[in-house]
């Protein structure tokens, strides 16, 4: 994972782990001061186990409107309503909100290859046949303006 390697080299006190969140994370109990979760699954019980006192989870959760410009031409999944509320409910007993969620929204100008990579990392990669997706990607313009939209949430141990 190039991003994790880059992060780990950014400072002597920074570490990065890429792991299956549904397995035990390869770190000691109470040893992590910050967990960053970007458009990825969350395991509140496991996050709470590894968080140090005062530690936080910073999560970016896709919000309705995220990548909407790609939905029709590629046939990819939309973001379901109530995603943040479900995450907060699932975290009960493990994590609680540390601050009010913030809406983050901006437009990105993406090349077709970047769009393919973005879709390949998303749940849509498992819902559209690879050959169909490649055909649809080829029909896109070389560059597109695409909206990124998510909610930034800070959580701490309950």
Locations of regions flagged by a protein language model:
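Short alpha-helix immediately C-terminal to the canonical SAM-binding loop
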Residues: 1-5, 44, 67
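Conserved Class I S-adenosyl-L-methionine
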Residues: 102-158
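Active-site capping/gating segments
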Residues: 79-114
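Short catalytic micro-motifs in class I SAM-dependent methyltransferases
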Residues: 34, 39-42
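A short glycine-rich, Lys/Arg-flanked "PGG" loop and its adjoining helix->strand segment in the class I
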Residues: 42-58
């Amino acid at each position: 994972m190039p991003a994790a390697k880059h992060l780990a080299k950014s400072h002597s006190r920074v570490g990065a782990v890429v792991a299956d969140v549904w397995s035990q994370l390869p770190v000691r109990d109470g040893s992590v001061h910050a967990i960053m979760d970007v458009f990825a699954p969350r395991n509140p019980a496991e996050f709470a186990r590894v968080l140090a006192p005062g530690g936080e989870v910073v999560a970016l959760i896709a919000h309705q409107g995220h990548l909407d410009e790609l939905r029709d031409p590629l046939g990819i999944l939309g973001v379901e309503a109530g995603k943040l509320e479900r995450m907060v409910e699932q975290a009960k007993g493990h994590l609680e909100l540390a601050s009010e969620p913030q809406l983050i929204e901006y437009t990105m100008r993406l090349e077709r290859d970047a769009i393919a990579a973005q879709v390949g990392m998303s749940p849509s990669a498992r819902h559209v046949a690879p050959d169909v997706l490649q055909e649809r990607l080829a029909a896109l313009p070389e560059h597109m303006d695409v909206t990124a939209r998510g909610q930034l949430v800070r959580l701490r141990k309950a």
